[in-house]
């Protein structure tokens, strides 16, 4: 259940960030509104980056060695 909540929180933060970007790109906000939206966008970006960093740390590759499963950190770079 906690995984779904974290996923929903990330997805909601990302959707909110996208909506803020659209509002800023429209150019219809006042300077004060734009600054407030930018500040909120920075906070949402940090939240999303934190969630992605946590997810990356949790992702592990299971390898079978001598009949036992061993965890290895996830390597995002494919091997050549």
Curated annotation (Swiss-Prot):
<comment type="similarity">
    <text>Belongs to the XseB family.</text>
</comment>
<comment type="subunit">
    <text>Heterooligomer composed of large and small subunits.</text>
</comment>
<dbReference type="GO" id="GO:0008855">
    <property type="term" value="F:exodeoxyribonuclease VII activity"/>
</dbReference>
<dbReference type="GO" id="GO:0009318">
    <property type="term" value="C:exodeoxyribonuclease VII complex"/>
</dbReference>
<keyword id="KW-0378">Hydrolase</keyword>
<dbReference type="GO" id="GO:0005829">
    <property type="term" value="C:cytosol"/>
</dbReference>
<keyword id="KW-0269">Exonuclease</keyword>
<keyword id="KW-0963">Cytoplasm</keyword>
<dbReference type="InterPro" id="IPR037004">
    <property type="entry name" value="Exonuc_VII_ssu_sf"/>
</dbReference>
<comment type="function">
    <text>Bidirectionally degrades single-stranded DNA into large acid-insoluble oligonucleotides, which are then degraded further into small acid-soluble oligonucleotides.</text>
</comment>
<dbReference type="Pfam" id="PF02609">
    <property type="entry name" value="Exonuc_VII_S"/>
</dbReference>
<dbReference type="GO" id="GO:0006308">
    <property type="term" value="P:DNA catabolic process"/>
</dbReference>
<protein>
    <recommendedName>
        <fullName>Exodeoxyribonuclease 7 small subunit</fullName>
        <ecNumber>3.1.11.6</ecNumber>
    </recommendedName>
</protein>
<keyword id="KW-0540">Nuclease</keyword>
<dbReference type="InterPro" id="IPR003761">
    <property type="entry name" value="Exonuc_VII_S"/>
</dbReference>
